[in-house]
Every structure is written in structure tokens, then in C-alpha cells.
Regions:
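Extracytoplasmic small-molecule ligand-binding "clamshell" domains
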Residues: 13-17, 26-58
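Bilobed "Venus flytrap"/periplasmic-binding protein-like clamshell domains
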Residues: 2-23, 83-141, 148, 251, ...
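A local structural motif
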Residues: 26-36, 117-130, 266-271
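A structural signal for short loop-to-beta-strand junctions that line the ligand-binding cleft
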Residues: 4-5, 67-76, 100
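Secondary-structure end/capping motifs
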Residues: 189-259
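Hydrophobic/proline-rich hinge and linker segments of small-molecule sensing/allosteric domains
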Residues: 71-93, 169-186
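Beta->alpha turn/N-cap motifs
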Residues: 39-41, 50-63, 127-128, 144-151
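Pocket-lining segment of extracytoplasmic ligand-binding domains
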Residues: 129-219
Length: 276
């Protein structure tokens, strides 16, 4: 049995996907799994330092890692929706470059998308959970909101832009790639990576078939949100592309990173995917 360190976030959608694995509903006979639970920006940094065998990261952060394959399962794609830029008072697009904008991490895909849209801006990095309060208190002019706050805060603030909708429009309908899971080629054999990918897919499929059971488990990570809101959030980001991204997911990941390279925001050598 192979021991693996598995990084994922304390977020409801990740909890939903890993529910069957974490509770033994889907048995892992090949792997002894050590769960490492951190926020996404911490996982991004740990992946860059190559500290974990398998981990969730932002698509943006993939351009900074080495020797990791992208798993086909477990990715988060927005289907004409995504991270939202909120403000307390209406903001015009031309004002954004001179505004102070709270961001949930420099390596998050949300930050990359905003840079693609408006270019350089005055970003103030903070934990994603602190951003709504920073907007309310006027500590920042606007805030880039991810996770379930995209939904829960939608009536409290002005929506400057929904970056998933913007991406959908400018790409002719592509899903917006936000989070992926990657596996180390240094510490794991290719066959082990493929086997884990299959196992992860089974865990996601189990959750989708046993929605209420998996949601009940996910509520431990709901941060005070209602079950109805978490259900809605999970259904948004655990979709058919999460089960297997397919060629559509591969293309959208490649397109986002290529756009980042074209605008000199990032650079990368190659994008490596796990075999189907």
C-alpha cells in the first residue's frame, strides 16, 4: 500500500468530492491517504515547493509548479459563472485600475482572470473569508469573491463583473477553469497516478449519486452557510467536467494559461495531463 499526502481545502465542494474516500464509502486498497487540509493559496505554495504527492491547486498556480500531472477528475469549472468582483458602491470599469481590490491570493485563478480583464491593479491580498467584511467596512474599493460567498453576498453588494460570465463571452462559450488536482511524477509512478485518478472519480460519482449524504458531510465545512446554499454551490462546481474534464476541460485550461503568457502575467514550459 502506497502512502500519499493528499492536499485539499476546507471548502464544501472539496469535502463533497472527497466524502466517499474520507469515510470509506469508496475503498482505497492501494493507497494509505494522509489528508492535508489547507486554504487554496497555502496549497498553491506547497505545490510550488513540491511538498505534497497529490493536491488541489489553482489553475493559475500550475504555471509555477514542476513535475506534476493534472488529474482528469476533481477540477472546478464555472459554466458561464465564476468568481465575482463586488463593490459597496457602483464602480465603472475604467475606475478599476486605480481602485484597491481585495484578492484571495496572488496565485488564484480568480486573480489571473481579473488581470486578463483589467491589466495591472492595486491588489490587497487577504484570506478569502475576510473579503466581504473588507468591502463592507470600506477597507477596499472592491473585492474578488470566491467559494460560496459568490452566492451568499450577491444581494449585499454591487456586482462589478462575474469573471466566469466574462470568460464565457470572450472565449465563445468555454468553461472557466478555476481549480485542479495534480499528482507528483517525482514521488508516484504513472500507474499509481492513473489509479488514484480512477479512485477519485469514483468518490465524486458516489457523492453525486448520494447527494444528501455527501452534503451532510460537507456541512462541516459550510462556515455558517445554509444547507440550501451549500447544495446550490456544490451543484455549480461539482459538475460533469469535475467527473472527467475531457478534451473540453483540457482546452480551457490551456487557453487560460496561454492567455496569461500572451499578456506576460505568467510563463510555463508544458501542461501535462494524466492519461485517460
Amino acid at each position: 500500500m502506497t502512502h500519499i499526502t493528499l492536499g485539499h481545502t476546507p471548502d464544501a465542494d472539496d469535502a463533497f468530492m472527497f466524502f466517499a474516500l474520507a469515510t470509506g464509502k469508496v475503498a482505497s486498497r492501494m493507497f494509505e491517504i494522509e489528508h492535508v487540509i489547507e486554504d487554496i493559496e497555502t496549497l498553491n505554495t506547497r505545490a510550488i515547493n513540491h511538498e505534497l504527492d497529490i493536491t488541489a491547486i489553482s489553475v493559475h498556480a500550475y504555471s509555477y509548479v514542476k513535475d506534476y500531472l493534472i488529474l482528469r477528475s476533481g477540477a472546478s469549472f464555472g459554466l458561464n459563472y465564476g468568481p465575482r468582483l463586488y463593490s459597496k458602491k457602483p464602480l465603472q470599469s475604467q475606475e478599476l485600475s486605480n481602485s484597491i481590490i481585495a484578492i484571495p491570493g496572488k496565485l488564484t485563478s480568480a486573480t489571473l482572470l481579473l488581470k486578463l480583464l483589467i491589466g495591472n491593479f492595486h491588489g490587497r491580498e487577504m484570506n478569502f473569508s475576510s473579503i466581504p467584511k473588507a468591502i463592507s467596512s470600506n477597507s477596499v474599493d472592491a473585492g474578488l469573491v470566491i467559494h460560496e460567498a459568490q452566492i451568499s453576498e450577491s444581494t449585499q453588494f454591487h456586482t462589478v463583473v462575474d469573471l466566469g460570465k466574462w470568460w464565457h463571452n470572450v472565449t465563445g462559450g468555454m468553461p472557466v477553469p478555476l481549480g485542479i488536482n495534480i499528482a507528483s511524477r517525482r514521488s508516484l509512478k504513472i500507474e499509481e497516478i492513473r489509479n488514484f485518478d480512477i479512485l477519485f472519480r469514483k468518490s465524486i460519482e458516489y457523492g453525486l449519486k448520494h447527494m444528501d449524504e455527501a452534503l451532510e458531510y460537507s456541512m462541516k465545512y459550510a462556515r455558517g452557510s445554509s444547507k440550501d446554499l451549500i447544495r446550490r454551490f456544490v451543484k455549480m462546481y461539482v459538475n460533469e467536467l469535475t467527473v472527467d474534464m475531457g478534451s473540453q476541460g483540457e482546452r480551457s485550461i490551456g487557453h487560460l494559461l496561454e492567455k496569461g503568457r500572451e499578456q506576460n502575467i505568467l510563463s510555463f514550459d508544458e501542461i501535462l495531463f494524466s492519461s485517460p
